[in-house]
């Protein structure tokens, strides 16, 4: 898939082994920035587990000018996250990744922390609805279970 961000083209592909270092760097930095209400230690301690799990997951990687600028993972229609490199945010990359999942799945779900206001606003703009507010068992933070349906009623 290719798309135009307004100033340069980007393309998506399935995660490759050689993508892992850049993807993990984006995962860590994006989580630290978006979730400053969760201790940094939590994200750093989870990095090895993420490193192990990513190659087995369904992951879409986004590149611009040969550089990885974002990625998203999904499990049976549940979006595990959309992560975009900080300098590339607000250029349509997250939307393009989300649109690819919308193209592939008739129903999407995800969880987003209540305090992550920018992500919450993004998903609401993209047609997701809040299903319920729940507490994350690990972090103790409140988050919304959200759903999008492309099924025509």
Model-derived regions: residue spans:
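Conserved N-terminal entry element of GNAT/NAT acetyltransferase domains
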Residues: 1-18, 152-153
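A short, internal acetyl-CoA/4′-phosphopantetheine-binding micro-motif in the GNAT/acyltransferase core
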Residues: 78-89, 112-113
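A short helix-loop-beta-strand connector motif used in the catalytic cores of GNAT acetyltransferases and
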Residues: 49-61, 78
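Conserved active-site alpha-helix within GNAT-family acetyltransferase domains
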Residues: 95-96, 115-143
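Conserved GNAT acetyl-CoA-binding A-motif
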Residues: 103-115
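Conserved GNAT-fold acetyl-CoA-binding loop/helix
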Residues: 20, 24-50
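Conserved beta-hairpin
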Residues: 58-70
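Conserved acetyl-CoA-binding loop-helix of GNAT-fold acetyltransferases
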Residues: 84, 90-103, 121-125
């Amino acid at each position: 898939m290719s798309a135009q961000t307004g100033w340069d083209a980007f393309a998506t592909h399935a995660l490759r082994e050689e993508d892992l270092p850049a993807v993990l760097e984006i995962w860590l930095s994006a989580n630290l920035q978006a979730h400053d209400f969760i201790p940094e230690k939590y994200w750093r301690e989870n990095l090895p587990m993420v490193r192990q799990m990513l190659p087995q997951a369904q992951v879409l990687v986004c590149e611009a000018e040969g550089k990885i600028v974002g990625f998203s993972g999904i499990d049976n229609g549940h979006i595990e996250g959309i992560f975009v490199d900080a300098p590339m945010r607000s250029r349509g990359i997250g939307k393009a990744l989300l649109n690819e999942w919308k193209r592939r799945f008739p129903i999407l779900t995800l969880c987003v922390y209540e305090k992550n206001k920018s992500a919450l606003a993004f998903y609401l703009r993209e047609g997701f609805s809040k299903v319920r507010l729940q507490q994350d068992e690990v972090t103790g933070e409140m988050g919304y279970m959200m759903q999008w349906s492309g099924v025509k009623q």
